[in-house]
Structures are given as structure tokens and as C-alpha cells.
């Protein structure tokens, strides 16, 4: 049976992650309160941030920025999109 969490992003009970997706306290907090569906929303948002800001994930400054945005995305009312961002049309 799948592990269920009360997802902080979706505001409902949903299937939880299989393991902490990030090291440290933030990873533990995400594991305990974020669903798989919400994590996928973050992955898409993170990809957009990396592309729009032309970040290199191995750069310590970029990693710190993404960590802060991840915390905001899940626990502080949401991460904002870059100024002037236009979502691709389908």
C-alpha cells in the first residue's frame, strides 16, 4: 500500500514520495508533507527556472537559489515566475 501524506501544496491527502528527494532538513520536510503529484509540479517549475535564468545546477549559487525557491514553492506561498516569463503555447 502506498504511503499517504497530507500534501501541503495540494491541500489534500495524496500518495507520498518513496524517499526524501533532497538532503537535510528540507528533504525531510518535503518527504513528510509533499505528494508525488506536487513534487512533479516542482520539477516542472524548477526546469522553467533553470531555463529562464540559464542556471547551471552544479554551480553552488544556482543550487542555493533553487533550494530557496523549492522551500518557497512548498512552504511559503509559492515561488514566482521570472519577470516577463511567457508560458509556451501548446
Curated annotation (Swiss-Prot):
Q: Which GO terms describe its molecular function?
A: iron ion binding
Protein name per its UniProtKB record? Probable Fe(2+)-trafficking protein
Q: Which GO terms describe its biological process?
A: cellular response to oxidative stress
Q: Does the keyword Iron apply?
A: yes
Might you report a single GO cellular component term?
cytosol
Q: Could you tell me which SUPFAM superfamilies the record lists for this protein?
A: YggX-like (SSF111148)
Q: Which family does it belong to?
A: Belongs to the Fe(2+)-trafficking protein family.
Q: Which organism is it from?
A: Thioalkalivibrio sulfidiphilus (strain HL-EbGR7)
Q: Which UniProt keywords apply?
A: Iron
The question of whether Iron is a record keyword is answered with yes
Instruction: Give the matching InterPro entries.
Output: Fe_traffick_prot_YggX, Fe_traffick_prot_YggX_sf
Q: What does this protein do?
A: Could be a mediator in iron transactions between iron acquisition and iron-requiring processes, such as synthesis and/or repair of Fe-S clusters in biosynthetic enzymes.
